[in-house]
């Protein structure tokens, strides 16, 4: 396994120009203006940068397990609702509470639940558990919109990593060494792990997960593929799914 010395905490708080409103509006018909929205893994409220003119801020709730992200979000968008989700995560909130569900801290129901690049950093079982929990927070006819990384984009992500070699001392990876017959790919910041759902993630400092499009429904059988949002929305490497 090749060593990749990245600091995962450096990658979480992001204030970027992604048009997340258009990402989640891709191939959907949502009454955004009247929708009650939960942004699961909201970071610093990045969805609102492009969406604030299309939604009512008082109908928006963002939760994140990074306390600093929540503090920044509250300053940026004081009219919206932000809640610190004190759940354990090996990279982003090691002191947090294990097995803390979103439904444990939220009492309301929502028309739309968003999760941008959340499951990029979750094991398969975590993804399944989280989505099952979030389904219980939906109003009738509500839906969850979420993105995952596609294995088809791995080469692009690999190139992105290599462009950061100088800054982060990342050794060049040999993509050809990775076999593509498996459902899931683990890209760990310390090691490369291929299709190892039984790996003790407590030993990993951080990771990314890539899914094969044709096999993702083995993981989430009822998820509907909504396509790949245009890259000019700033959503490189992401594919969009809907779950009701």
Describe each model-derived feature in a short phrase.
Residues 117-118:
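Short catalytic micro-motifs in class I SAM-dependent methyltransferases
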Residues 128-140:
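A short glycine-rich, Lys/Arg-flanked "PGG" loop and its adjoining helix->strand segment in the class I
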Residues 114:
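A conserved beta-strand element that flanks and buttresses the S-adenosyl-L-methionine
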Residues 123-124:
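Helix-capping/helix-break motifs at membrane-protein junctions
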Residues 1-34, 44-57, 63-104, 145-244:
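Class I (Rossmann-like) S-adenosyl-L-methionine-dependent methyltransferase catalytic domain
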Residues 35, 111:
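Conserved acidic residues
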Residues 40:
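Conserved beta-strand/loop positions that form the S-adenosyl-L-methionine
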Residues 106-109:
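A glycine-rich helix->loop->beta "capping" turn
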């Amino acid at each position: 396994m090749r060593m990749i010395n990245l600091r995962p905490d450096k990658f979480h708080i992001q204030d970027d120009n992604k048009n997340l409103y258009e990402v989640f509006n891709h191939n959907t018909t949502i009454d955004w203006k009247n929708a009650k929205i939960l942004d699961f893994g909201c970071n610093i409220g990045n969805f609102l940068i492009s969406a604030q003119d299309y939604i009512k801020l008082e109908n928006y709730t963002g939760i994140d397990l990074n306390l600093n992200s929540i503090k920044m979000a509250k300053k940026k968008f004081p009219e919206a609702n932000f809640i610190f989700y004190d759940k354990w995560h090996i990279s982003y909130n090691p002191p947090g509470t294990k097995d803390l569900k979103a439904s444990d801290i939220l009492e309301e129901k929502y028309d739309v639940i968003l999760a941008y690049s959340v499951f990029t950093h979750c094991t398969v079982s975590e993804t399944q558990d989280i989505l099952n929990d979030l389904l219980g927070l939906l109003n009738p006819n509500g839906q969850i919109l979420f993105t995952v990384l596609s294995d088809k984009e791995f080469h692009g992500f690999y190139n992105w990593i290599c462009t950061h070699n100088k800054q982060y001392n990342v050794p060049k990876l040999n993509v050809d060494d990775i076999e593509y017959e498996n459902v899931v790919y683990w890209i760990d910041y310390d090691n490369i792990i291929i299709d190892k759902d039984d790996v003790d993630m407590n030993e990993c400092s951080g990771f990314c997960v890539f899914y094969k499009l044709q096999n993702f429904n083995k993981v989430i059988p009822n998820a509907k593929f909504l396509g790949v949002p245009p890259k000019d929305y700033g959503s490189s490497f992401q594919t969009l799914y809907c779950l009701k």
